[in-house]
Amino acid sequence: MPYNGIDNYRHNEPDRLGVLITNLGTPDAPTTPALRKYLAEFLWDPRVVEVPRPLWWLILHGVILRIRPRKSAEAYASVWEKDGSPLLIHTAKQAEGIREAMKQRFGTNVVVGFAMRYGNPSIPRVLEEMQQQGVRKLLILPLYPQYSASTTASTFDAISKDFTRRRWLPDFRFISHYHDFPPYIEAMARHIESHWAEHGRKEKLILSYHGVPLKYLLKGDPYHCECHKTSRLLAERLGLGKDQYMTTFQSRFGREEWLQPYTDETLKALPGKGVKSIDVFCPGFSADCLETIEEINEENREYFMESGGEGFSYIPCLNATPGHIDALVQLVEDNLQGWDIPENTPESLEQRATLAEERKQATFPGRSDI
């Protein structure tokens, strides 16, 4: 197979470090055709749905993609903004915040980009752009604090697949999780405290994470454990007792058993147990998206209030808040340790080009195609 290379490489071009942040993805528009395309890519990933491919193809194309895109398009339309989906907007702002911090410290020697595992901007497209910008050392940061094969490993798969098509591979580092990274815990704690200072504190804090099938845990996926560790560390930092917070799991899909307790069932039951007011925060979501804005702040709010609840306060995700950007920058800088920042002064680039030309003339005299 042909491999993608770099045409017309010149030795006076800068070498750079790259930082690529990724998130799950978003459709290109809140329309049925766009959702059908997006869901086809997302739900066909074997990391997401671990069902034998022939059987799953029939279910996906014969049933799901005929029914779900229209319903999902309506949900996305309810949260869509003029600049696109909330997840895309927040992720772009997060990348810009990290980029500005890197620029202040390293100038133009560090390139920061963002990509989506599904949809656009795609991982292959952004990797190609970074290669063309001279990235020779690459750090990948999937914005999933808690590791799961269905998210983090899927991102690794996509990057590895792209690398199989490239002739020149960069040095490569991959951050698989940061569920217990102290600056991340601190950023969440201060964010929640700020919300409480402005809006008051409810009886109980619900920490809702995206769910995964229970069988993933039984097969060794650490996601469940990492979610609970994040919750424990956050609660300790906030000074909460065990009866003052709960860890729940949302967004289940299909009929099989997922991680429990389920967020929706928990919120329906709490008022009957005497808990009349709650704060809800989603530590596993680095940015607000359909699952937080529509599912939690609208759908689950309604479940709680209709069941007898009297107060429901949704605490937004960290998004591109200064505390979150600071935590992500520290995570990036910690993982760049040991990599020398390229020296791209005009003098050093000219010297490198001169030495390369001398070697070329000595080895391939008279050749103009090298």
From Swiss-Prot:
PROSITE patterns: FERROCHELATASE. InterPro entries: Ferrochelatase, Ferrochelatase_AS, Ferrochelatase_C, Ferrochelatase_N. The keyword Membrane does not apply. GO terms for cellular component: cytoplasm. Keywords: Cytoplasm, Heme biosynthesis, Iron, Lyase, Metal-binding, Porphyrin biosynthesis. One of its GO terms (molecular function) is metal ion binding. Pfam families: Ferrochelatase. It is found in: Cytoplasm. GO terms for biological process: heme biosynthetic process. The keyword Cytoplasm applies. Its main location: cytoplasm. Fe cation binds at residues 210, 291. Its EC number is 4.98.1.1. It comes from the Bacteria. Pathway: Porphyrin-containing compound metabolism; protoheme biosynthesis; protoheme from protoporphyrin-IX: step 1/1. HAMAP family: Ferrochelatase. PANTHER family: FERROCHELATASE, FERROCHELATASE, MITOCHONDRIAL. Belongs to the ferrochelatase family. Catalyzes the ferrous insertion into protoporphyrin IX. This is Ferrochelatase. The lineage of its organism: Bacteria, Pseudomonadati, Pseudomonadota, Gammaproteobacteria, Pseudomonadales. The gene is hemH.
